[in-house]
A protein has these predicted regions:
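Short glycine-/polar-rich loops that comprise or flank the Walker A/P-loop
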Residues: 1-2, 13-17, 39-41, 63-66, ...
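A short beta-strand element within the Helicase C-terminal
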Residues: 102-117, 139-143
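Post-DEXD/H (motif II) to motif III coupling segment of the RecA-like Helicase ATP-binding lobe
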Residues: 1-11, 148, 154-155
């Protein structure tokens, strides 16, 4: 008989790399054109500097593209909340430094964008490792500036035409903050029960619940978020009176 050891099988990185020629001198506009070409898929935009993250964030705000920022210059609490909003799809895009290229818990992604090129092959490889894992395919996009050469490890990437835009849907999810957590003996089931019974929502309207030691975060449709805050704020969850608010950026 033939013995197959499945533990020896290794996940194959199913990754394609593509270059995007800047359509104008405005690199930020090319980035937005690419995001609009890709539609409503979640992805990470990698930058080298905190200043770059800030400028990309301001531009995406103007274009009404929901996003979160993630860098070493932020407080741990703010980084954690950025990831929560990205995981539950309140944010479509995560704008990040290389801190997000390893060791963070995010769902399987279809794409990443190198807004600024990695300084080393190792950083480039770690960034690309966020996509194309396990069974799904992913694409890493590199923004190619005119008269600026790409590193050797990127030069074989095929150029892609991004002139065609996908239909972008409006933001669906919003994140609610609850001021009670595990230390208050609150469970995910307790939170779901509160939203079903007192919030009068359906199962389809309850998104991802993330439970922490002293608080919790719940994704709900943006269209009913304020309504749920009015219904549930200052109610009792287990024995604790909790605040329920919309999580601000």
């Amino acid at each position: 008989p033939t013995t197959v050891n499945y533990l020896e099988e290794k996940a194959v990185l199913k990754l394609e790399t593509r270059t995007v020629q800047l359509s104008s001198k405005n690199k930020l506009q090319t980035l937005v054109d690419l995001i609009e070409h890709l539609g409503n898929q979640p992805g990470i935009v990698f930058c080298n500097l905190r200043d770059s993250i800030d400028s990309v964030s301001r531009f995406l705000d103007k274009k009404n593209i929901k996003h979160s920022c993630f860098s070493g210059g932020m407080e741990q609490k703010d980084r954690e909340r950025a990831l929560i909003k990205f995981r539950n799809r309140t944010s479509q895009i995560l704008i990040a430094t290389d801190l997000a290229s390893r060791g963070i818990d995010v769902p399987e992604l279809k794409f990443i964008i190198h807004y600024e090129m990695s300084r080393t092959l190792e950083e480039y490889t770690h960034r690309n490792g966020r996509v194309g894992r396990v069974k799904s395919k992913g694409t890493a996009y590199v923004l190619k500036e005119e008269n600026r050469d790409l590193p050797e490890f990127v030069k074989n990437s095929r150029a892609v035409n991004i002139s065609k835009k996908s239909v972008r849907k409006a933001q669906f999810w919003e994140t609610l903050f609850i001021s009670g957590g595990r230390k208050d003996k609150i469970s995910k089931g307790d939170i779901a029960g509160l939203f079903f019974k007192q919030g009068n929502i359906t199962k389809d309207q309850l998104g991802i619940i993330e439970l922490k030691q002293d608080c919790a975060f719940v994704a709900v449709p943006k269209s009913i978020a304020d309504q749920l805050v009015n219904k549930l704020n200052n109610t009792r969850l287990k024995k604790k009176k909790v605040r329920v608010t919309v999580l601000q950026s």
